């Protein structure tokens, strides 16, 4: 058991970056009430299933219930009177923010400003170096094992092809029948952000590197997808990549940027897509706002997110040029 599997083993977390209560480090959100929901369920707080392991051990996946219980408690403790709120997360937590964004919005009156921020969670369904879809295989296992259907936005599920049913059935019954007829493939598609964001109605900010270090290491070039140590040095530090390897990374970037077109076209959404070799930028001071923070349009991430959330600029959508064009990308940024 690890800290990800039990709250008994969780270690203390330092509140830095977007979580900081220091004005200098977090000028726009330093005086907000901040709650961190520690990641522990393995499916971005989406699962709701129980089953049996091969040895007869009972397995319970309750991420969705954990999410609902935490939000219920926060509402009871005063969040119900909030005038502004931001649901955010990084990596798997970023995917959770997307999955639950509209649900979070629905908890509040319409005159409350609710927005979402997704940091380093724009996972793409791309083939790895061997031609396999390693990330798809992993996510498919999660979708199947944890029964994530109830957490997926109904708008996304509604866009998938249902089993043909009689047209005279009422819409509510039709939708129930439709849900029951969805294939695992349909559920899998709605777990990937490229499909997921199409049905999110709440204003959302996508913060991501288009050379995301976690995806390059675990989805594009996972161990076993290449011979020997051919990619080890490149995966450790993008500055070590050969021109041939960079061509492959540029291809990864091209697909990620193309899938962000949906977000780019959405009114009230924001983008900060840098070309730094990093993963998770908002929770760390060095990335969020510091002397060596990545900058796009001469804005740090903190400034761009603040401009977007508080409407200081009409549009906040930055997409970087290809690596290594951005001189503000530092080798000291966090990777995973």
Regions found by a protein language model. Give the residues of each.
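C-terminal His-loop and adjacent cap/lid subdomain of alpha/beta-hydrolase
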Residues: 1-336
């Amino acid at each position: 058991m690890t800290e990800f599997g039990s709250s008994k083993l969780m270690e203390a977390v330092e509140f830095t970056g977007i979580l900081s209560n220091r004005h200098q480090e977090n000028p726009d959100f330093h005086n907000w009430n901040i709650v961190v929901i520690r990641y522990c369920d393995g499916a971005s707080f989406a699962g709701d299933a129980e089953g049996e392991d091969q040895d007869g051990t009972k397995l319970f996946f309750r991420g969705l219930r954990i999410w609902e219980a935490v939000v219920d408690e926060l509402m009871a403790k005063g969040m119900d009177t909030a005038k502004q709120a931001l649901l955010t997360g990084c990596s798997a937590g970023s995917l959770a923010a997307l999955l639950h964004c509209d649900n979070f919005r629905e908890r509040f009156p319409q005159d409350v400003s609710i927005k979402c921020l997704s940091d380093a969670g724009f996972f793409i369904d791309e083939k790895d170096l061997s031609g396999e879809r390693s990330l798809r295989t992993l996510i498919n296992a999660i979708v199947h094992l944890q029964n994530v259907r109830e957490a997926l936005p109904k708008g996304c599920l509604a866009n998938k092809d249902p089993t043909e049913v009689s047209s005279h059935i009422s819409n509510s019954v039709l939708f129930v029948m439709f849900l029951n007829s969805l294939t695992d493939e349909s559920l899998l598609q709605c777990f990937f952000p490229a499909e997921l964001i199409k049905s999110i109605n709440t204003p959302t900010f996508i913060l991501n590197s288009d050379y995301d270090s976690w995806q390059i290491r675990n989805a594009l070039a996972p161990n076993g997808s290449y011979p020997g140590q051919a990619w080890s040095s490149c995966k450790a530090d993008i500055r070590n990549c050969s021109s041939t390897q960079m061509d492959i990374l540029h291809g990864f970037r091209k697909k990620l940027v193309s899938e962000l077109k949906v977000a780019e076209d959405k009114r009230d959404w924001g983008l900060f897509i840098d070309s730094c070799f990093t993963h998770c930028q908002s929770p760390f001071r060095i990335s969020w706002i510091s002397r060596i923070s990545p900058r796009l349009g001469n804005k740090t991430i903190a400034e761009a997110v603040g401009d977007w959330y508080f409407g200081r600029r009409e549009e906040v959508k930055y997409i970087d040029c290809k690596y290594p064009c951005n001189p503000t990308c530092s080798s000291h940024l966090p990777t995973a």
